[in-house]
Design a protein with these regions (language model features):
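Conserved alpha/beta enzyme-core scaffold
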Residues: 2-340
């Protein structure tokens, strides 16, 4: 009986792997599909616009934040539209880009924040994780982009604080590490002007972020009135906070979603009055390999009831795609230092 149970588990595991490989191949075939001119027929609000129209609202020199984490809740339509506008018109240019979580594809996957890693388009990149953003790292290596790293927790506090007029955060995080300007470089990995976003003050570090002008985030669905729903998204991260910050700073808040639903005030959502633009991308993804039109429940709040199986499936996907960094002893030690 025990042997039979084990064999059944192996069979299920093999079936899972075969299905996941099928998903990988299907995703590879469609991973750069997009319709940047799409408008939903059922829209009522005039806040609905195409991806290209939304990109045209971003001014030169703006500070832009994109929400999301790794391959989850990516703002792909915005990345593509901004890049294509820049390649066609040379605008917007000189952007500062903020990304709390790692949002790159290690130079392998399209539709990540690496799309805007073009010389002159983004001239300063601030993030809590830069290893996956190979295009940004290459620009910094060429001396064309200022690169800054900050702790993710302090970044989210700063973003939330901007909505309340708070411009800095004091913390002991990072003391006596490379983030401490007294013994390291502070936030600056490379900065052409010697600027820094971290300052020492006794037994605390003082962290800062530039004021957010444009907030971009990925929701699941919108209703015809322009409310954006966060059901079935893989990550929410700092979506609410970045929208509130941009609005408080007199800037723009824009969302991309995967489809339309009827209005439902009982569901978690960002209300239409907080948004300046809503873009519908029929190819929008909940996460890598999972279109928003067919969300994977294991990525949704509450999961699918089998967390262990979900974790094993994710590990297998990561081994196949090799998009998630593999951390060695040095990276682990740096992580421990930064989290003291």
């Amino acid at each position: 009986m025990i042997l039979a149970d084990r064999l059944e588990g192996v069979a299920v595991n093999l079936v899972d792997k075969a299905l996941l490989l099928g998903h990988v191949l299907a995703w590879r075939a469609r991973w750069d599909r997009r319709d940047l001119d799409y408008l939903p027929a059922e829209r009522i609000s005039d806040k609905f616009m195409t991806g290209r129209e939304a990109a045209s609202l971003i001014p030169d020199g703006a500070t832009v934040i994109s929400s999301g984490m790794a391959g989850n809740s990516r703002c792909s339509a915005f990345y593509w539209a901004i890049r294509e506008r820049y390649e066609a018109e040379g605008r917007p240019k000189g952007l500062t880009w903020i990304s709390v979580g790692g949002q790159g594809g290690r130079g392998r996957a399209p539709g990540t924040v690496e799309e805007v890693g073009r010389e002159g388009l983004v001239t300063r990149f601030i993030s809590g994780h830069v290893e996956t953003t190979k295009s940004m790292l290459a620009l910094a290596e060429k001396g064309c982009l200022d690169l800054h790293v900050l702790p993710q927790g302090e970044m989210t506090e700063l973003i939330e604080g901007q909505a309340r007029g708070i411009t800095c955060v004091r913390s002991r995080t990072g003391l006596d590490t490379f983030l401490d300007p007294r013994c390291g470089s502070g936030s600056a990995v490379f900065d052409r002007n010697g600027a820094n976003l971290v300052h020492a003050d006794g037994d605390e570090l003082v962290y800062e972020l530039p004021a957010i002008d444009v907030a971009l985030f990925c929701g699941a669905y919108a209703d015809p009135q322009g409310n954006v729903y966060l059901t079935d998204v893989a990550t929410i991260t700092e979506s609410h906070e970045s929208v509130s910050a941009a609005r408080a700073n007199g800037g723009l808040a824009m969302a991309v979603v995967g489809g339309m639903i009827e209005e439902d005030p009982s569901l978690p959502r960002v209300p239409a009055e907080m948004l300046d633009a809503v873009v519908v991308n029929p190819y929008n993804e909940q996460t890598i390999m999972a279109p928003q039109s067919k969300p994977w429940k294991m990525f949704c709040p509450g999961g699918d009831g089998d967390d262990r199986r979900a974790i094993e499936r994710l590990r297998f996907i990561n081994r196949v795609l090799r998009l998630t960094p593999v951390r060695g002893p040095v990276e682990a030690a740096l992580g421990r230092l930064g989290a003291r």
